């Protein structure tokens, strides 16, 4: 793919993005990269000029009626994954003859024939499950009049349900909470805590009473000491255990000091996530069930001592003593619980577009439970299902084993973008040429329907803005108000957050506020504008309200705080 004798100089930086990332964020991402390079050049050191691709101005949203406007391909991640597969198949298995591949694996399509692509075309449906988003791209590939392979997008979208959500579910239910074995060493933090509390004497509880100034915990301990029966004592102990868990993992409260908050965040990144990652790696490797010790997970990199001390001081026992249960069936259950609604929805879309090849990409697709879940809803013959984590891409790939398998899944998007750029500029790669004009022209934003966003189930309800309804008079009784968007107007379609509307005026917002909001579906369907805002007495409050772009909303807290950043789990409330 290159000349080893030629000095390497960086001339161009290609930046990819999730397939349906809001257009304003896509533009800003590339502009920030350009600004970063400009800032670096202020040190006076002579450097080669570097271009950012795609250029921010080349991917800005354009009015639907501007048919002559030029746009670049957005270098979306799902299409980049498809290009790795397509290039490998054409070059490694079909001797550079894309037509042979299309004739063997594809079929004629009426929608492609209408664009001038006669004969067989290959339609690939790819699901790229990343950490933060799951990207869908359904794309047909034909050969144009001058022999270039031409991708034509049929359907695309991004869903904010992915690997991080699987990780959170495992941390919540297999590491922090869940389980009631009654074992003082084996289980989850909650189950081990409850088992240990049940063995404590009144003298030990009295000592804890003297060592805590948290009122809720003091009340729990007093109830334990005053319990008139074994049953009431058991209930009081259970409540005390809940409060200990909530005060440590449940989010910011008046009981938390600054040290408590920092330790909760660090516990998440240094302890909880590494244990969950260790379990997922065992699951990916099809390991049998086993128990996991502290030294199994942290053999090389142990958590900071202050974290372990803080845990011991709060809960009364050493974290290092816990034995974790790795049970493959439990991990599979968590994966199914999180991903079933989305996999079912994606399967319907793949079936509707009658794809020839189904591709699963991203590290989570190495998990057998995720593939099994997909096949439950979309049965497909083995030769039509491509799992990129196991695909023999060939030795040309920069990050491959000697057998041609990809060693690092995170490189797939980068290599796919590299192929997309080189094959569509100049002379292509080894005779492999791409015409990206349809991708650039037709891949627009997907926010067809906008309405009130419900974080807990990723839904928009009710739908307010439609292609034919450009203006909404919204009655607001509380702030913030979150807007979400979706491509299809069906009740179960996965939606994503887009804006948050906030009160920025002095004092409290009026209880009954009417806000007039508009958007132009033809000009920029993602852009909302506040036209007017007034209260029941007719007072104008337009200047006191702000629409702020916000594409990340936590499904538990309902705000922009991510569990990976703050380590809190709202479900721990009683």
Kindly give the residue locations of the regions a language model identified.
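Conserved phosphate-binding loops in N-terminal lobes of ATP-dependent enzymes
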Residues: 1-24, 30-34, 574
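Terminal low-complexity/disordered tails
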Residues: 330, 334-353, 366-369, 448-574
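Phosphate-binding glycine-rich/basic clefts of nucleotide- and phosphate-handling proteins
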Residues: 19, 138-313, 420, 426-503, ...
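Conserved helicase motor "Helicase C" RecA-like lobe of SF1/SF2 P-loop NTPases
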Residues: 28-38, 366-387
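Hydrophobic, small-residue-rich alpha-helical packing segments that form membrane-like cores
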Residues: 3, 19, 30-120
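Glycine-rich phosphate-binding/hydrolytic loop that grips phosphoryl groups
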Residues: 58, 62, 66, 70-91, ...
